[in-house]
Amino acid sequence: MMKRIAALLLTLAVALCAALPVFAAGTIEVTEDVSVSDDYDWTRFQGQNLTLNVYNWGEYISNGSDDSVDVVAAFEKLTGIKVNYTTFDSNESMYAKLKSGAANYDVVIPSDYMVAKMIAEGMLAPLDYSNIPNSQNID
């Protein structure tokens, strides 16, 4: 399960970022504030009763407070995928929880030094770029 984290991390990051307004020729309006490019099949998982468990730093993804866009809600509406979004306050607490096996997350978003440590300990899997349709735009 831990080996899926890296692949799903980038997939979710790309998808969540894509849920922000884009300025492309063809777009799909998700909400009044969110539109996405129509060159991807965002609905391909609808009806499959999927849940994505995300473990991230607090305040990394806007939640609709202070007139911001609720990115998770927009992603759920667009894709039909339920997101369980949990936050942590330090790399060390995140690492300890994952290492102990007390948690089962699909996507974890640690800082750079912790990513290196987790890779060295075999906790992360290589990314499968064929599952990331926008990967050619990543520098």
Give the positions of each predicted feature.
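A structural signal for short loop-to-beta-strand junctions that line the ligand-binding cleft
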Residues: 39-43, 103-107, 125-139
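Early extracytoplasmic/lumenal segment of secretory-pathway proteins
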Residues: 26-117
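Gram-positive cell-envelope targeting signals
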Residues: 1-26
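A generic structural micro-environment signature
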Residues: 7-8, 63-67, 94, 130-133, ...
